[in-house]
Amino acid sequence: LIGPFMDLIIELALTKPFTELAPVSKKGLDEREHEELVTRFFAYSDGLEGYRDRPSEFIFNYVKGMNEKVATQPELTEQYRIRFTETMVFVENAFPYGFRRSQKGKATPRARFEAIAVGSRLAIDQNPALLQQNLHNVAGWLDGDDFARVTGSDGANAIARLRERTGFVRDRLLGV
């Protein structure tokens, strides 16, 4: 899929701090995993209307629609760039290992990325003041059994599981 929104995804997939927060293997780089993660961030944080437990189809349709939308509303490019950058800086400040499971982790599990990235964005959307806060309390739940359960790969693409993991992070960040 080529178009102005896809160009933005490719651009953002190469930026810091994202590439440092979300390490992927050489194979993952070759398979454009960073672009996949950026695309999932936007697709899932924009809402899951039309999602039917088939991420590839949902994401394809999302990017196709956004390419058309950005072509007629080019100002959206900067809005989406800011949204992504803001979220990555927030994750860098709030989550000690970024999207990794541990400090020395060399991989970014998709379910973990979705939970943290999308959950953070949803929390920021509800309470923009989070961007100015210093959050020190994530380690307690980040390393807990509940977070491990919601980010497990079992049925990870089911919409209920996707909502559960993104909602888990959103609610913890909002103190719900």
Question: Can you describe what each PLM-predicted range is?
Answer:
Residues 1-149:
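Solvent-exposed functional surfaces
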Residues 137-176:
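Acidic, carboxylate-rich catalytic segments that either coordinate divalent cations
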